[in-house]
Amino acid sequence: MNNSMISPSVVDLLEKIHDRYSLVILTSKRARQIIEGAEPQISIKSNKPLTIAINEVDQDAVEFEILEEGLK
């Protein structure tokens, strides 16, 4: 794991999602789902939707599919 102040680090997340654009789209869409009432897929102390979404991606709790025309 990287010794950064942010956990998980962007470098760690980019090992799962191979480009920054897709990472931003995935986490923002998931955060929006949480804001709209979706239950978090992980147990986490934070109540911030984006923090929850980022940690869900890090813990492989979010399923996604990358299509030629973009993220689904």
UniProtKB/Swiss-Prot annotation:
It catalyses: RNA(n) + a ribonucleoside 5'-triphosphate = RNA(n+1) + diphosphate. GO terms for cellular component: DNA-directed RNA polymerase complex. It is an enzyme of class 2 (transferase). InterPro entries: DNA-dir_RNA_pol_omega, Pol_omega/Rpo6/RPB6, RPB6/omega-like_sf. Promotes RNA polymerase assembly. Latches the N- and C-terminal regions of the beta' subunit thereby facilitating its interaction with the beta and alpha subunits. PANTHER family: DNA-DIRECTED RNA POLYMERASE SUBUNIT OMEGA. NCBIfam families: rpoZ. Belongs to the RNA polymerase subunit omega family. The RNAP catalytic core consists of 2 alpha, 1 beta, 1 beta' and 1 omega subunit. When a sigma factor is associated with the core the holoenzyme is formed, which can initiate transcription. This is DNA-directed RNA polymerase subunit omega.
